[in-house]
């Protein structure tokens, strides 16, 4: 039986969690979803940002448990750090097929605005500078690290109400670009960050 690891990625408020609750159980038949934000809410529902470090540690431990027990699972990340590269390579050595689902927003201002709305609705805040840093680093790591190493990737524009597939890489093939204008927009952010 094939083992699957799904990495749900994108900047803050790109719609990762919302999409995960539909895509994972209903389409991919994946019942294990590890999410540091949800863990933090479980520890401190009214101030989850105060326990983010502890939630991250619990998340890493849970990922290790799932890998060691050869279970299908997914986890959420902004891709802003290189932390999970070794986890992905380790999973592949253990026979996992690793799929990255990347949810992109057309600009960082949209991410900032969505976080602002989330706060007005009672959600946790993230400073604008952190959102900007994660947005750029996520795109940079997408191209520098993760596109080359994952088995499969789906890149979506999630700026509007309905997400749109921009590019895909299936079964270790070359990346197939379905919307070259939007894919080039993402690459332009990457090239700008490399200067």
PLM regions: where:
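ATP-binding Walker
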Residues: 14
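Conserved substrate/cofactor phosphate-moiety recognition/catalytic segment
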Residues: 20-71
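Glycine-rich phosphate-binding loop used to anchor ATP phosphates in small-molecule kinases
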Residues: 54-105, 138, 154
């Amino acid at each position: 039986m094939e083992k699957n690891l799904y990495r749900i990625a994108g900047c803050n408020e790109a719609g990762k969690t919302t999409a995960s609750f539909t895509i994972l159980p209903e389409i991919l038949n994946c019942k294990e979803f590890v999410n540091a934000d949800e863990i933090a809410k479980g520890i401190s529902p009214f101030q989850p940002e105060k326990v983010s470090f502890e939630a991250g540690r619990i998340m890493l431990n849970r990922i290790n448990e799932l890998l060691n027990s050869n279970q299908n699972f997914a986890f959420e990340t902004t891709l802003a750090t290189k932390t999970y590269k070794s986890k992905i390579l380790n999973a592949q050595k253990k026979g996992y097929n690793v799929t990255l689902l990347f949810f992109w927003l057309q600009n960082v201002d949209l991410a900032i605005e969505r976080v602002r709305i989330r706060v007005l609705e009672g959600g946790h805040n993230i400073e604008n500078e952190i959102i900007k840093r994660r947005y750029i680093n996520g795109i940079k790591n997408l191209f520098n690290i993760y596109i080359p190493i994952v088995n499969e990737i789906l890149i979506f524009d999630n700026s509007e109400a309905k997400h749109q597939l921009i590019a895909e890489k299936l079964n270790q093939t070359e990346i197939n670009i379905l919307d070259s204008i939007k894919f080039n927009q993402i690459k332009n952010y990457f090239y700008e960050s490399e200067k």
